[in-house]
């Protein structure tokens, strides 16, 4: 059974499980939230940007935040202050973020809502623990959520406009190679479970919003129906946490955003599941 944990978000994104609580970005409110099992929310950071922004953590526990329109990767210090971890503005706007078990931060971007015919402007950047930056993937059709396997050997990224989950091998130096289709399904903010399947918001074959558990190759293993569009999900404490909002696919981006800023419909939903989370984030 699916239950409502919290209502009143603008657009919840970047679902994470960290230190025994559910965390997310509350787009439109400039907030990073942590929410406990009773639905009590705490603002953990305020991000001076619009949208998008995404979150993850370095191995030492410091929070990283992508400030998308500004092209910055921010880091939260012990004082709570957000400082620049890496200036990536020369590459363009940023979207999603994942940090692997070695402290490598992968940041994607180039998410053009109206690319030219045949254009795939998306990219993935690697920010290593020593601060160096390099571009490790190109030609992505609106890169979105990413996951990395527990052994740090494979990265999977959702190409929302390409309608596929795309996988890469990860080398010891963090480079990506051997691009391939992991599953022929679109995705958004996603997570991996201990069986190697991926949970992601998506759509049923009949076009209804749902959170899907997908096996490598594309088989749908489980489906959790959703009333509104799903944006991201994660696993924690035996529970699938899902972020939804009343986004209308037939309306322009600005129309949706204006409506949701006026009447927030964002929710955190929960659904019990037996297979625990694995990998990163």
Model-predicted regions and their roles:
Residues 35-36, 75-78, 128, 169, ...:
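Structural recognition of the beta-propeller blade-terminating site
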Residues 31-33, 71-74, 122-125, 164-166, ...:
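A short loop-to-beta-strand structural motif that recurs across blades of beta-propeller domains
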